[in-house]
Amino acid sequence: MSMTDPIADMLTRIRNANMVKLQKVDIPSSNVKVNIAQVLKQEGYIKNYKVIADNRQGVLRVYLKFIDEKDPVINEITRISKPGSRTYVDSESIPTIKNGLGIAILSTSKGIMTDASARQAGIGGELLCTVW
């Protein structure tokens, strides 16, 4: 059975693993998911990620980050643009998340990037999710 929203599945797996304080979580891999994991690592929300090859699509292993080994760094991770209701923003209307404490992840013509990078480049795109 195919999945309707693989990005929402990735975010839900990360959210659930954070709640039970798992050190790592395995997610079916895709290029978009790897790019989202790369942004999360650059912004310091996860420790690391690794793509493990198998005979199918591969597995994206995400190593979660905790403060003092008990509190997760990611407080909230929310999907914004969904398959049934896409959300697009231009560079002037990219939202500020939690007064600048969080980030928005956008899919732009230049690739997947944070809200700050998109504002600096002057481009908009699809608002994938917010993290803080």
Curated annotation (Swiss-Prot):
The keyword rRNA-binding applies. InterPro entries: Ribosomal_uS8 (IPR000630), Ribosomal_uS8_CS (IPR047863), Ribosomal_uS8_sf (IPR035987). Pfam families: Ribosomal_S8. One of its GO terms (biological process) is translation. Keywords: Ribonucleoprotein, Ribosomal protein, RNA-binding, rRNA-binding. GO terms for molecular function: rRNA binding; structural constituent of ribosome. GO terms for cellular component: ribonucleoprotein complex; ribosome. It comes from the Bacteria. Part of the 30S ribosomal subunit. Contacts proteins S5 and S12. One of the primary rRNA binding proteins, it binds directly to 16S rRNA central domain where it helps coordinate assembly of the platform of the 30S subunit. Belongs to the universal ribosomal protein uS8 family. NCBIfam families: PRK00136.1. This is Small ribosomal subunit protein uS8. It comes from Trichlorobacter lovleyi (strain ATCC BAA-1151 / DSM 17278 / SZ). The lineage of its organism: Bacteria, Pseudomonadati, Thermodesulfobacteriota, Desulfuromonadia, Geobacterales. The gene is rpsH.
